[in-house]
Amino acid sequence: MQQDRTYRHHGPEVSGWFSEQLMTGKIPLTEVFVDVENKPSPAPITIISKNPKTTRKSDKQVQTDDASSLLTEEVKAAINSVISAVRRQTNAIESLEGRVTTLEASLKPVQDMAKTISSLNRSCAEMVAKYDLLVMTTGRATATAAATEAYWNEHGQAPPGPSLYEDDAIKAKLKDPNGKVPESVKQAYINLDSTSALNEENFGRPYISAKDLKEIIYDHLPGFGTAFHQLVQVICKIGKDNNILDIIHAEFQASLAEGDSPQCALIQITKRIPAFQDASPPIVHIKSRGDIPKACQKSLRPVPPSPKIDRGWVCIFQFQDGKALGLKI
């Protein structure tokens, strides 16, 4: 029976081998034929019958390992794809940030042009109003004021071409109840007068801020935290309070154009502009001398009875204990 199993499982080659081994005595009969009454040892059968099962399990394990390996490769490929996409997005974002920064830098001059455009706008409005009046009141010498007035009286309007007439004369005629001025001329004069008044009221104010003026002057000064830097802050503060920042700016630029140094230009501002004449320097409250910039330490002096800005006194440093030192240039 065992031989049949062996034959079934292993084929005729193995069966012939067993026969040869039995005939030569190399395999004892006691190991092959077992008494039916005695329970046969299942070891040979177990070994022979379980070998295919073990092979199947091994095959399944190999298949499982292959599937896991394939899944791992797919996961790795997916992760690499995601990493590549994230890198591309990061590069695109960095490129966009660079372009936005470049665009901001390019638009900065346009923003700075706003003040110039505003100034041109009001200048053009005033120029148009003056031109309307100019066409009606000035021109060829042959068209005298008397001829123009005669034309007014006859036709009730301004002559078609330019004519000579002074601005003050029109103003006097408008105030005169008996004066005859054409409606078109009157309207042109009113437009010019209202435009001039509007410019003086709305555009006569500083077109530069205290911060901008401070930065402009700082760019011309060497070092940092010097007595002249302190003077710039004082000048800008007083200029803002007195609404004269544009005058200070013009005076500073004029001094530089004349060849003066920035320090000399600042001193000239304190001496030429009335707001600084006989003006007392501001008081700066500090805790100790260490709060004063190092560049100003050598310019500290005892405070005189009546310090003035136009005499070189920039500010007064007031300590907590009541003592005071003046910054002198």
Swiss-Prot record:
Pfam families: Filo_VP35. There is a cross-link at K298 (Glycyl lysine isopeptide (Lys-Gly) (interchain with G-Cter in ubiquitin)). The keyword Acetylation does not apply. Residues 204-329 form the VP35 IID domain. Residues 84-108 form a coiled coil. CDD domains: V35-RBD_P-protein-C_like (cd21030). GO terms for molecular function: RNA binding. Residues 1-49 are annotated as: Chaperones the nucleoprotein. GO terms for biological process: symbiont-mediated suppression of host cytoplasmic pattern recognition receptor signaling pathway via inhibition of IKBKE activity; symbiont-mediated suppression of host cytoplasmic pattern recognition receptor signaling pathway via inhibition of IRF7 activity; symbiont-mediated suppression of host cytoplasmic pattern recognition receptor signaling pathway via inhibition of TBK1 activity; symbiont-mediated suppression of host toll-like receptor signaling pathway. The modification Phosphothreonine is found at T195. It comes from the Viruses. Keywords: Coiled coil, Host cytoplasm, Host-virus interaction, Inhibition of host IKBKE by virus, Inhibition of host innate immune response by virus, Inhibition of host IRF7 by virus, Inhibition of host RLR pathway by virus, Inhibition of host TBK1 by virus, Inhibition of host TLR pathway by virus, Interferon antiviral system evasion, Isopeptide bond, Phosphoprotein, RNA-binding, Suppressor of RNA silencing, Transcription, Ubl conjugation, Viral immunoevasion, Viral RNA replication, Virion. InterPro entries: Filo_VP35 (IPR002953), VP35_IID (IPR031163), VP35_IID_b-sht (IPR043061), VP35_IID_hlx (IPR043060). The modification Phosphoserine is found at S194, S306. Phosphorylated by host IKBKE. Phosphorylation contributes to efficient viral replication and transcription. Ubiquitinated by host TRIM6 to facilitate virus replication. One of its GO terms (cellular component) is host cell cytoplasm. It is found in: Virion; Host cytoplasm. Plays an essential role in viral RNA synthesis and also a role in suppressing innate immune signaling. Acts as a polymerase cofactor in the RNA polymerase transcription and replication complexes. Serves as nucleoprotein/NP monomer chaperone prior to the formation of the large oligomeric RNA-bound complexes. Regulates RNA synthesis by modulating NP-RNA interactions and interacting with DYNLL1. VP35-NP interaction controls the switch between RNA-bound NP and free NP and thus the switch between genome replication and genome packaging into the nucleocapsid. Belongs to the filoviridae polymerase cofactor VP35 family. Homodimer. Homooligomer; via the coiled coil domain. Interacts with nucleoprotein NP and polymerase L; VP35 bridges L and NP and allows the formation of the polymerase complex. Also interacts with VP30; this interaction is regulated by VP30 phosphorylation. Interacts with host IKBKE and TBK1; the interactions lead to inhibition of cellular antiviral response by blocking necessary interactions of IKBKE and TBK1 with their substrate IRF3. This is Polymerase cofactor VP35. It comes from Sudan ebolavirus (strain Human/Uganda/Gulu/2000) (SEBOV). The gene is VP35.
